[in-house]
Amino acid sequence: MNAVHELARLYGVAATYMDYRAQPREVSVQSQAAILAAIGIDAADEQAAAAAIHQHQTVRWTRLLPPVVVVETGEPLVVPVSVPLDLDATWLEWRISFEGGRQRKGAARLDKLKVVEEGSADDRAYRRLSLTLPELPLGYHTATIALDTGLSGEVRLVVAPARCFEPPAISSGTRVWGVAVQLYALRSQRNWGMGDFRDLRELIREAAPLGCGIVGLNPLHALMPANPAHISPYSPSNRQFLNVLYIAVEDVPDFAECEAARQRVAAADFQEKLQTLREPANVDYVGVAAAKFEILKLLYASFRSRHLEQDTERCQAFRSFVEMQGEALRLHATYDALDAHLRLQGPQYWGWPSWPEDYRDPTAPVVVRFARERAQDVEYFLYLQWLAAEQLREAQASARELGMAVGLYGDVAVGADSAGSETWANRRLYRQGASVGAPPDALALKGQDWGIPPQDPNELRTQQYQPFVGLIRNNMRYVAALRLDHVMSLYRLW
């Protein structure tokens, strides 16, 4: 095996695959080297590949603990511990911090632990020991392990159920039928030119009495408010958040309090505009966005004066939502505000890869300063996400109240747009030098290129799978079931 093949094996880049005719195909060294380059690994020649292998092995042996250990409930919880042979260590102490806040402590003699592997890095010998910890409850926990020499580290412990939850109607074997809809395509005489969350509630109210147990939806992921012509739900800006064009504007509580918004919507020219938006066979996304954002900005101004400045219960509900969503939502709202700001300066700014260099890093001082100086612009997009989340939550609540066996069935796209907020907020995870697709088959003899940057699986593990956890958590928050677009991507990705 040459160095490039060995390096590819270490980083999980396949050497072969089965084509659609069930014939084995080899992946060329050039393709393997290109994929490695996309994840930041130099494999241009044998010498570079050998150096990269050495670096990989050095990190593997010199790190005391892996970043994360995942087990299913009932399985032994075994943590590998890498210890230098020349280190005069006798004991280790461990402390588990449970997800709920309590802690548990223990200790072990190193000479009583099983040696599972031996190796070396930079002329120093190591042994990998197997530390078995007590069985833990479901959840995300943290273990701190310290040797008596002072060397210490942390590992995230993920204890997962053996399978996904099934509602009683499914687990009992009952057959459940439902409908699948593209929400944007729902028509009504009151919406503003595209299906919205009130239309979804109306669909639930009509379908539930007929025995419908599930309503399947297209991905509802956040797109780009400043570029409403970017319409594909399968190329979203951020899969953790929602497309705010689905907000039913007149159902927002602030609409009833905002005289300016009500007068504007009631105006003859605005009503004529809404009727025009409802008429075409295809959704006029640009027109819908213009109408909705015109009124939503008025509602935000009213919300600020009536609630944020008065610290009302509605203000507290908004603040709680923002706090719950945390840094991920703050960065998404910052991106939307920045994107809107820069697009006003010209078409050369079509997404973060085209932004001035300093703005491409979400932690850069210029970005932090922008978020501080344009705080209300950022807060406006936080507000929109809150409105969308509340209306989707109400739709699922309606499904439950009306006795649907399951309720809303959400959809998670396979990836995020290369110029959107999800990739901007975590550039180390997404590899812009490659794109996701599918191998050749009978319908696409040249294969498919979906134009979506893949995640680096090694970086995902380094980040303790937190991006995946956040993705599933946020998408399950307001639905009862979830479809992962291309579930095979949990195992492999073309």
How should each PLM-predicted stretch be described?
Residues 1-60:
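Long, contiguous interaction/targeting segments characteristic
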Residues 5, 33, 204, 396, ...:
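Short glycine-/small-residue-rich flexible loop motifs, especially phosphate/cofactor-binding loops
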Residues 22, 101-103, 150:
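Detector for glycine-centered tight turns/loop "hinges" at secondary-structure junctions
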Residues 37-108, 114-146, 159-426, 460-461:
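Acidic/aromatic-lined carbohydrate-recognition and catalytic surfaces
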Residues 148-154:
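Short acidic/polar inter-strand loop motif in beta-rich domains
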Residues 381-402, 463-494:
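Active-site neighborhood of glycoside hydrolase catalytic domains
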Residues 405-466, 471-474, 492-494:
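Substrate-binding/active-site clefts of carbohydrate-active enzymes
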